[in-house]
Every structure is written in structure tokens, then in C-alpha cells.
């Protein structure tokens, strides 16, 4: 068997026909500058080929469902294993996904509660026993005399299929009728069911009229029905068609409540049998929110205070205006009064309606005037009703802007039905258990006392649950709860959850490819992660990690440094081998930082700010313990703390959302806090995250930064364009006129291959240039518009050196380390770190007011040490201009250059949410209680 994975002639993206041998069954780190080609080698070449070879082995029918698998641009790869990629882009946005379902722990929990749970009555809470035939008969005998009823045996409950055997068995048993999905059918006729739908089938065992001497016949019929269905009997009263379920399995004698047989699906919130009937298992409902309908109560109705769709148009002849004028007349207010000055009675009528009370509405139409008498529904009620009724996706989106998620009133966020929540193991229902943190859940399971047969049944289930919880703890996620929605996890958290799931599967001989697993991890938890990666390797797997973290590099068996620069300056193997080999290579930028030849210097002094502060009072979102936090304005401030300590809750949920609403007029609902002081010292908030700058191939750095408008104006001002009468619109690839119509300005044409992957080929008409021939004939300094879009930022800087307006925007792209990115490069091909730096460059190119606060969440994600160096210089420039920069960060190189640090903790989850220490890096390093301080001490 080969002991290397041998890649020959890789040319994906910017790779320059490289060849490399990676040792198998080892921990291999790929490093290099951002954009140097690491991901192209790891994901677009090695992983893509491993995946493609696996899919090739499947039938063409199976391949049809698996989407496209292009052959990567590489000559050959030998020694490849089946590849599993664990990246950060695949966080589930499905509201039904939770940490428990993603890790599959919840499947084992459902099994445990179904097999070992103690059912209770959902009404009175008493433990429930099974009912005997005599008890069922006694209950039925209490019906009033002459009541007509029938007994049914439920033989199929919510199962797909045609169920012909069920009908044949019933005919052979001498039965005449069945009830299917609520309708009665005669068994003498042929019954055809849709095999793709779920059906309920009940055999009608007997039809009876209640009289005193019925007990004997009733007992026989109940027994027959119970035997047919495995213990269930349905009593159907013919006078009101109501059903009562009896179970030989579980029932409460006091309340008459019967429970079905416990089964795993009863505990699934994705199954109608277990889900809460009101919210269908989501745990939340969208409710019209007055604070989003009226985001700014200092405005009057005529100034547009009411922002709900349908009520935001208050022109003279609008229906909304007529209603508001009638309300103003009735409740004696003016439409020019600020909304906050209206009486409670008037506000209630505007928001919740006038009930049955009529308003007198005067209207004018082309055919004359008129008067209407009718009640007003209220804005909140109107939004809620239209949201429930509309079938239009666009309308849903528009109305959603005025709605907020609230816990479901029936299950209070627990997602399951009353019956499912009434079953306990160790005194807890399944959702109470899921709300425990991973570490608490593990200790609950380790101390769970079960007796007799139940202990034997539970043994294997408990072993699986405990091992999976231990793996989650091992990758630094002890603070998460199993009920946490997967969509709320950060990229790093979701990646580590999938890592824990993979360890749980205990595969060997697999190639695992990971993309920066240390993201979002505090230095303290990094050692646990490295132990996990070593464990995965020791099982007999090859672990290939794309990483910039120094600790991971020092722990690796083999390092490959891709570079030497980024983009066109990268794509080569600079060095490969042990840590010492990388340090010894003079061309390796990574080696220079590892050896200490290059390093990020400490600043000469710390800024104290401009004397003003932004103060958050009473922050209590998620695990925050009612904090009062001060941020000095005019400084570079870092918020630090272990994973789950409350950094994102404080900065993103409370501060950013409040500032965005107050300064940028955004309609968002901030987290829980009392008040924020010091807003008057700011005029703008800018949140710079790693989300894509555009989701279509048409979006690119030139369009995002606003540079493309200037370039189009420049081409439109050339003598050639003026002679032809071309305006700036002629040079847009999004509108008809100048673009190539064969590919609609995309430059690529999609060819559907049905059984094979769709193929994208350059457009034959324009050759991938996006524009038609006439547009491309207009030149500036010998280049056409397509040539300019194909330039890297570095090339463009020299090309436009005499045009300060354009040059300054391009210079900021180069300053943030994106000199290698092409101006027209599709935004879908940019990494998260690159997208973030495009946003930073856009902000840098704007005129600074000195009163802006910039909020960044882990800006060093995806950045090499050399890029972090550049990023810090850019952030310091923003602060030097008088602005405030607030960063959530784990990277010690960024933390050590900050002016002020707010360290949260001390732990994650419930044990976090407090301020451990605030002050300069030196003050934080002196604090014994701060984990951040202990690691920072070594760098100062």
C-alpha cells in the first residue's frame, strides 16, 4: 500500500502546475498567505477528485441526484482515499436543525425516552398505568342510554403504502367496513390508496346502541378490536362524530386521558405524532411586532412612522390615509403629531383595531364622494392576517420585516406535544434534558440510576449518548445545549460539531480535509482540538488541515507552505517538510514569522480615547449576567473570552443591532438590555462581517466598492464613446445595450447535460468578455473595459495612476492585502476573509467623519500572519482618523495591539457572561483569573 498521496500537475485556480507528495495517516498542515492557493489544492483538487471517484462508482441514475462533479484540473492523484470535507460553509440554516439532531444524539435520546421513559398524565401529572379490558368497558358503559356508537380497531396509523394486505386480512376476518383517513369505505368494493401518502386505517368491529345489558357483547367487541390493533380501541360516537381513544397500554383513570404506545417518533418534533400542533415543531411563531411596525416613534403618521406594508403609503387618496384620518377624528389627534405623543387609547386603536366599533370614513373617488361606516382591523392584526393568508413569497418577505419570532404559546418553545413532554427519564422530560449544556448533560447521564430490565435495555443507548457528548466536550463545545438551533452557530462551532460527529463514527483509512478548525476557539481550547485531530489520525486516517494557527503547525507531522505571495504571485510549493524545514527556507514568509525573524510589533503607546464613552447598561441577552460595559470612543477595543462566554451576545446581538436601528434606521430587534448611553457621540455604525459581498457571479470587487461606476464614467468620457453617443450605461454588463446578449453579460453559458454535470463554457460570441464587439472597440490607453475588469488591483493601480479618484479606491484594495484580486473577479469565488477585506477597503475609501464605530467579528479568520499584520495597520488607520474600532477576537497578535480589552467569562455557557477584567493588554495580562491574560502575558 502507498504511504503518500501523490499530486501531479495541479492547475486549479492560481496553482502553477504543481506536484506534491503528502504522507498518508499523518496530520498534514497546508499553510500560506490568504489567496495563495491552499484551498485550491486541498478542496478544489484533492477533495474534489476523491469525491468524484466515489461518485463515478455509482450508477448513472444515482449520479443524477448528486449534482455536478467536474474533474479537477490536475494530471493525476495517486494513493487517494475516500475524502470527507469538514468546512465552515455548510452550517444548516434549517430552523428544525439543532445541535442534538446534527450530532444524531437526539435520535438516541428519542429511543431512550421511548423505551425507558415513565409516562405521566399531561393534565394532572400523575404517572400513568396501562388500562385493562374491564376498565375500558366500564368507561364506555357510562355513555347516556340510547347513544349510538361504533368501535374501531386502528390497524394502520400514519404509514405510507397501498395496504392491500390489510384489507384482505379484514375481509377474511369477516369485517364489512373500514374507516380510511376519516371516511367510511365498504370492503366489498375495491379500495385504491395513494402509496406515497400517509394513511390512517381503522377496521369497524361493531356498531352498537347503549343499553344497560350491553356489557357482555361490549366486552367481546373491545377484546376483538384490541387484539386486531395491538391494544388500541377507538370509540366513535355517531351523534357528533367524536373519537375517544382507549389504550390497553397507557391511560390516566382520573382525567380519562389515554396515551399511545411510546415510540421514538413521539419524541420527534419533525413528525406530526410528536410535534406541537400549534407551531408544528418549530418552537417559535412569527408575530407582528409593534416596535418593528413603528421603528421611530418621534415621527408622525404623515412622516411615515408606520412602516408596515400597506400602511406606509399615506398619500391623500390612499386607503390607509382615509382610515388614519377617521381614527384621528375619533380619538382627537393630528396626523402631524409625533406618534409617541398619542394617547394609549389612540395607539391601541391604530395597532389593535376598534373591535366591533365603526369608524366614519369619508372618501373621494373620480365618480364623487362617499361615506363608509366600518370598524378598523388594526395594523398589527392586519399584518398577522395577511401573513397567514398570502401565498406570495414576495409578500411574505415584505410582511416579515414587521414580525419577530416569539416562543410558541402552547409548547413555550419546547417543540413537542403535551403528551410527549409528559414522559420522563430520571425525572426530566426530553426537552428539559436538551436544554442542559453538554457538560451538564454528560454528568446527568453518568449519574442516571435505572433498575431491572430497563437498565439492561438502556445500557447500549446510554453508551452511545455518553460517547458522543464526550466528543463534543473534547472539541471545546461543553457550553452548547442540544436544543440550540444549528442556524445560530458560528462557522467554527458548526465545523467542530461535524468533527465530533466524524470521531463518533470511528472510521479508518479516510482522508479528512478541514478548513481552519481553530476559528472561534480561545487559545485555552486549542489544545483540546489538537488532541482531537491527533485522535482522528491515530485511528488510521490522513488529516489534512488548511490552517494559519501557529500551535497547529507546531503539532503537525508535515507542513506544506503554498505561496510565496497571493493570487498570481502564489500557487507554488515554497517549502514542504517538518517545522524545521519550513523555518530554514528563506523564501517562506510563514517560516520567517515562525522563527521570529518577522513579527507583529507592539504599538509605541496605547490610546486613551477622546474622553467620551459608549456605555451599555443591564446587558442580559442569552448568558450575559446584567452587565454594565463601557467602551472608550476613539480607541481600538477588543472583546475577548473563551468560546461561549457571551462576546457575540454583547457585541452583535445588543450593541450592533441597537446602533444599526438608532443610527442607520435598520429594522432589527436588539437583544435584552436596559439602555445605551453615549449614542450622541456617533453618527454611523458599520458592521464588517465575512458574509459574501454578493451571491451572483455578476457581483465583483469593482461593483461592490463603487469603483466600477467611476470606470464606466471614464470610458463614457473618451472621445470614441462620445462620438458614438455611448453613456455610462453602455459599459454595464447588467443592462441591454453594451453587453453580449448571447450570455446576457455573464461571460459563461450553462449547458445542461442531464445525467452528467452541467457544464459552463465561455460564451462563443464574446469569448467570455461579457460585452459586444462595438462596446469593446472603445479604448482607454489601449485597453477596453473587459481588459480593465481582468486586471488585478496591483496592475490597475499603475494603469490609473493619473486619476486620483479611481486610484484611491484601488489603493485601499491593495492596502488591505487584495492586490492579487482581479477587479472583475466573481464575488462567489472570494473567501470569507477576502469578502471582509473588500468591505474594509470600501469603508477606507469613504470620507471619514471621525464619528463612526466599526464592529468586526473575528476579522482574522482565513488570514495568514502576514495578512493579519496588514489588517492591523488598516484598522489602526481607521482609529487614527478619530473613529472607534470594536473587534471580537481570539488572535493574540490582534489582542496585544489593542488600546483597551473587555474580557468576558470566566467560562462558556452558564458559567460565563461576566466581565473578568477590563483595561489595557498589560492590565489584562496581570489578571490571574483571565485565561486571555495568561496567554497574553507571553507576548508582552
List where the protein language model places each region.
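Conserved phosphate-binding elements of NTP-dependent enzyme cores
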Residues: 1-940
Amino acid at each position: 500500500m502507498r504511504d503518500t498521496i501523490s499530486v501531479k500537475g495541479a492547475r486549479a485556480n492560481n496553482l502553477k502546475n504543481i506536484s506534491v507528495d503528502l504522507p498518508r495517516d499523518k496530520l498534514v498542515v497546508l499553510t500560506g498567505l490568504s489567496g495563495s492557493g491552499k484551498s485550491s489544492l486541498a478542496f478544489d483538487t484533492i477533495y474534489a477528485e476523491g469525491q468524484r471517484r466515489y461518485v463515478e462508482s455509482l450508477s448513472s441514475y444515482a449520479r443524477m441526484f448528486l449534482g455536478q462533479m467536474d474533474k479537477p484540473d490536475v494530471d493525476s492523484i495517486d494513493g487517494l482515499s475516500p475524502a470527507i470535507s469538514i468546512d465552515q460553509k455548510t452550517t444548516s440554516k434549517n430552523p428544525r436543525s439543532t445541535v442534538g439532531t446534527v450530532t444524531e444524539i437526539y435520535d438516541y435520546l428519542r429511543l431512550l425516552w421511548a423505551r425507558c421513559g415513565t409516562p405521566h398524565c399531561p393534565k394532572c401529572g400523575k404517572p400513568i398505568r396501562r388500562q385493562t379490558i374491564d376498565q375500558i368497558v366500564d368507561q364506555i358503559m357510562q355513555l347516556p342510554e340510547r347513544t349510538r356508537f361504533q368501535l374501531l380497531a386502528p390497524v394502520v396509523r400514519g404509514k405510507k403504502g397501498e395496504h392491500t394486505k390489510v384489507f384482505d386480512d379484514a375481509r377474511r376476518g369477516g369485517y364489512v367496513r373500514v374507516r380510511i383517513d376519516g371516511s367510511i369505505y365498504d370492503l366489498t368494493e375495491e379500495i385504491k390508496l395513494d402509496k406515497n401518502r400517509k394513511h390512517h386505517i381503522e377496521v369497524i368491529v361493531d356498531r352498537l346502541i347503549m343499553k344497560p345489558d350491553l356489557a357482555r357483547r361490549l366486552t367481546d367487541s373491545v377484546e376483538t378490536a384490541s387484539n386486531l390493533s395491538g391494544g388500541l380501541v377507538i370509540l366513535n360516537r355517531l351523534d357528533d362524530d367524536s373519537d375517544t381513544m382507549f389504550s390497553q397500554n397507557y391511560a390516566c383513570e382520573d382525567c380519562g386521558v389515554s396515551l399511545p404506545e411510546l415510540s421514538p417518533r413521539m419524541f420527534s418534533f419533525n413528525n406530526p405524532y410528536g410535534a406541537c400542533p400549534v407551531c408544528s415543531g418549530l418552537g417559535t411563531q412569527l408575530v407582528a411586532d409593534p416596535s418593528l411596525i413603528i421603528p421611530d416613534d418621534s415621527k408622525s403618521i404623515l412622516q411615515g412612522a408606520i412602516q408596515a406594508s400597506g400602511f406606509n403609503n399615506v398619500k391623500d387618496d390612499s386607503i390607509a390615509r382615509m382610515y388614519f384620518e377617521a381614527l384621528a377624528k375619533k380619538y382627537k389627534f393630528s396626523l402631524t403629531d409625533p406618534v409617541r405623543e398619542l394617547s394609549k387609547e389612540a395607539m391601541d386603536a391604530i395597532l389593535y383595531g376598534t373591535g366591533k366599533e365603526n369608524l366614519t370614513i369619508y372618501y373621494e373617488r373620480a365618480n364623487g364622494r362617499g361615506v363608509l361606516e366600518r370598524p378598523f382591523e388594526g395594523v398589527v392584526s392586519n399584518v398577522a392576517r395577511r401573513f397567514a393568508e398570502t401565498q406570495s413569497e414576495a409578500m411574505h418577505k415584505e410582511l416579515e420585516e414587521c414580525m419577530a419570532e416569539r416562543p410558541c404559546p402552547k409548547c413555550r418553545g419546547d417543540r413537542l406535544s403535551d403528551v410527549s413532554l409528559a414522559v420522563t427519564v430520571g425525572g426530566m422530560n426530553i426537552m428539559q434534558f436538551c436544554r442542559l449544556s453538554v457538560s451538564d448533560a454528560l454528568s446527568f447521564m453518568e449519574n442516571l440510576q435505572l433498575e431491572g430490565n430497563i437498565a439492561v435495555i438502556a445500557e447500549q443507548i446510554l453508551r452511545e449518548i455518553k460517547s458522543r457528548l464526550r466528543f463534543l466536550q473534547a472539541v471545546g463545545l461543553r457550553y452548547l445545549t442540544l436544543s440550540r438551533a444549528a442556524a445560530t452557530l458560528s462557522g467554527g462551532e458548526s465545523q467542530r460539531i461535524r468533527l465530533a460527529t466524524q470521531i463518533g463514527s470511528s472510521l479508518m483509512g479516510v482522508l479528512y480535509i478541514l478548513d481552519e478548525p481553530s476559528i472561534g476557539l480561545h487559545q485555552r481550547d486549542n489544545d483540546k482540538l489538537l488532541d482531537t485531530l491527533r485522535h482522528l489520525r491515530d485511528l488510521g486516517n490522513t488529516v489534512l488541515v488548511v490552517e494559519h494557527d501557529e500551535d497547529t503547525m507546531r503539532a503537525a507531522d508535515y507542513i506544506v507552505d503554498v505561496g510565496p505571495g497571493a493570487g498570481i504571485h502564489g500557487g507554488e510549493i515554497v517549502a514542504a517538510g517538518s517545522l524545521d524545514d519550513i523555518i530554514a527556507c528563506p523564501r517562506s514568509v510563514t517560516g520567517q514569522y515562525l522563527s521570529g525573524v518577522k513579527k507583529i510589533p507592539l504599538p509605541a503607546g496605547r490610546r486613551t480615547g477622546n474622553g467620551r464613552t459608549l456605555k451599555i447598561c443591564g446587558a442580559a441577552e442569552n448568558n450575559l449576567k446584567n452587565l454594565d460595559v463601557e467602551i472608550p470612543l476613539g480607541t481600538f477595543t477588543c472583546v475577548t473570552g473563551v468560546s461561549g462566554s457571551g462576546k457575540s451576545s454583547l457585541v452583535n446581538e445588543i450593541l450592533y443591532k441597537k446602533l444599526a436601528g438608532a443610527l442607520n434606521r435598520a429594522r432589527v430587534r436588539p437583544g435584552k438590555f436596559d439602555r445605551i448611553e453615549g449614542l450622541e457621540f456617533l453618527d454611523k455604525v458599520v458592521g464588517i462581517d465575512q458574509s459574501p459581498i454578493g451571491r451572483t457571479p455578476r457581483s465583483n470587487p469593482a461593483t461592490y466598492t463603487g469603483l466600477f461606476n467611476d470606470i464606466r464614467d471614464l470610458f463614457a468620457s473618451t472621445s470614441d464613446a462620445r462620438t458614438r453617443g455611448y453613456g455610462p450605461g453602455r459599459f454595464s454588463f447588467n443592462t441591454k445595450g453594451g453587453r453580449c446578449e448571447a450570455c446576457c453579460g455573464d461571460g459563461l453559458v450553462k449547458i445542461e447535460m442531464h445525467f452528467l454535470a452541467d457544464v459552463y463554457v465561455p460564451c462563443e460570441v464574446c469569448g467570455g468578455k461579457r460585452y459586444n464587439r462595438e462596446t469593446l472597440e472603445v479604448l482607454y490607453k489601449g485597453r477596453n473595459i473587459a481588459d480593465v475588469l481582468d486586471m488585478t488591483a496591483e496592475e490597475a493601480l499603475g494603469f490609473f495612476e493619473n486619476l486620483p479618484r479611481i486610484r484611491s479606491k484601488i489603493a485601499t484594495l491593495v492596502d488591505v492585502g487584495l492586490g492579487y484580486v482581479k477587479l472583475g473577479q466573481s464575488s462567489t469565488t472570494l473567501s470569507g476573509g477576502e469578502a471582509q477585506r473588500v468591505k474594509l477597503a470600501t469603508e477606507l475609501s469613504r470620507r471619514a467623519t471621525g464619528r463612526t464605530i466599526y464592529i468586526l467579528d473575528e476579522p482574522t479568520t482565513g488570514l495568514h500572519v502576514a495578512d493579519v499584520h496588514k489588517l492591523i495597520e488598516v484598522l489602526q488607520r481607521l482609529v487614527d482618523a478619530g473613529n472607534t474600532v470594536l473587534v471580537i477576537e481570539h488572535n493574540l497578535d490582534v489582542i496585544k495591539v489593542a488600546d483597551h480589552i473587555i474580557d468576558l467569562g470566566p467560562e462558556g455557557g452558564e458559567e460565563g457572561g461576566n466581565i473578568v477584567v477590563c483595561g489595557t493588554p498589560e492590565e489584562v495580562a496581570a489578571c490571574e483569573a483571565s485565561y486571555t491574560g495568561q496567554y497574553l502575558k507571553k507576548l508582552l
